[in-house]
Amino acid sequence: MASKSQFPYEDRARDHPNPLARRLFQIATEKQSNVVVSADVTTTKELLDLADRLGPYMVVLKTHIDILADFSAETITGLQSLSQKHNFLIFEDRKFVDIGNTVQKQYHGGALHISEWAHIVNATVLPGPGIIDALAQVASAPDFPHASDRGLLILATMTSKGSLATGQYTELSVELARKYKGFVLGFVASRSLEGVETAGKADDEDFVLFTTGVNLASKGDALGQQYQTPESAIGGGADFIISGRGIYAAPDPVDAARRYQKAGWDAYLKRVGR
């Protein structure tokens, strides 16, 4: 798979064919940050407080909205307001994994109304191509008002020990990203996918890579999570680094966010030769 990871964010913001990817790289350039905060908290108050305090230092806020015990319309209006205030995107880590008809309802309806507020969502290709097609249909529908501001990340690899997201699964992830590149921004992956070759490759493709499990202090947890540092993640091809407990569970989350911002940005500057 072709990679443009050696190019500066501002170049990718200028040249990227996907409008949401352009916006993502523009925000990163303006804020000098490639940090995605995974705010795995369980109340709306905690979530909005973190989003407000950490908003200046992150590019994307990643949510697991279904773990909130008190989710309501106020949760969403609060997130949208803070997204505008601090100029960050919202990534709902829903990991869609069902038949197409079901994921369309999960994405565009139900209790969560995800398509109305989440700029980015993700999915696994375990159900086959239909899941990506179904989500893309929602975003491209004539009556959908947010088409240019929505995108999908395909879960191509995982950081948990013993993950089966390898080999043919990863290859299918790349193949479907190429087929639906108007909607697919890129991947959630623990490493660069540059060596993955499939049909449909184009010289100008520029898929964005989000890497999870980034932690400055820990190498893992008791449940099989495996961490890497901002420097190793960016050096390995990540465009954006996702950190959860390393930031929000720190004694001073704001100080932690600043440290991750600096570490991630320094690693990016090193990668592009600045």
From Swiss-Prot:
Single GO cellular component term: cytosol
One Pfam family per UniProt: OMPdecase
Enzyme class: lyase
Biological process per Gene Ontology, one example term: 'de novo' pyrimidine nucleobase biosynthetic process
Active-site annotation: K95 (proton donor)
Catalytic activity: orotidine 5'-phosphate + H(+) = UMP + CO2
Pathway this chain belongs to: Pyrimidine metabolism; UMP biosynthesis via de novo pathway; UMP from orotate: step 2/2
Disulfide bridge partners, by residue number: none
Enzyme Commission code: 4.1.1.23
Binding-site residues, substrate: 40, 62-64, 93-102, 227, 245
Keyword entries, A-Z: Decarboxylase, Lyase, Pyrimidine biosynthesis
Molecular function per GO: orotidine-5'-phosphate decarboxylase activity
PANTHER family named in the record: OROTIDINE 5'-PHOSPHATE DECARBOXYLASE (PTHR32119:SF2)
Family statement: Belongs to the OMP decarboxylase family.
Protein name: Orotidine 5'-phosphate decarboxylase
Organism whose genome encodes this protein: Coccidioides posadasii (strain RMSCC 757 / Silveira) (Valley fever fungus)
Gene it is expressed from: URA3
